[in-house]
Amino acid sequence: MQETIIKRHEVMQTTRNYLVKHRFHEVEIPFLNKSTPEGARDFLVPSRINKGEFYALPQSPQTFKQILMVSGFDRYFNIIKCFRDEDLRNDRQPEFTQIDMEFSFVNQNMVIECIEGLLKEIVKTVKGIEVQTPFPRIGYDEAMERFGKDAPDTRIPFELKTISDIFTNSEFNVFKSTIANGGIIKALPVKDDGKLSRKMVDDYTVWVKTFRAG
């Protein structure tokens, strides 16, 4: 645990040094705020002075973005706690830390290059590994076509393949209606000569459902 805490400190210090070098200012924003529409429920803090009224802890740090931007802070960041009252999952918890970077008068490539540089600096400082940039990039359409999701894990060597032609004359209603309605049928090729037993397929079906798939 000590090693993890030290690495976390190194990541934060590297982040601050990098962003300050790139003309960002670190801005501290209030925790006690009004409730705003977000993706989860707010954690509420009762007000002692205003009976029956509550503050809301921030779900994301962008609440003050417009005020800061029009006040002249065209580049700022904060490393801040966020709070979301939602069901626990493997990748969800009620309190987490977020690195928030906001900057004006930039285009998409400028944003990507800035973040690539930050990640490269963090990995070099914390792990001693030199990462090559720019990172490989694929567009949304290509990602959906090849992987079926917009944020694929490219370490997984499987890609979706279109097999609609195989089922052109199929009487299986699921495939038949899909093709008739202009849809396509895709499959995920499995190596090892397709040696999957029925039990293995059933086990995989149960497993993917834990990720709310299928």
What are these regions (language model features)?
Residues 1-214:
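Class II aminoacyl-tRNA synthetase catalytic cores and aaRS-like
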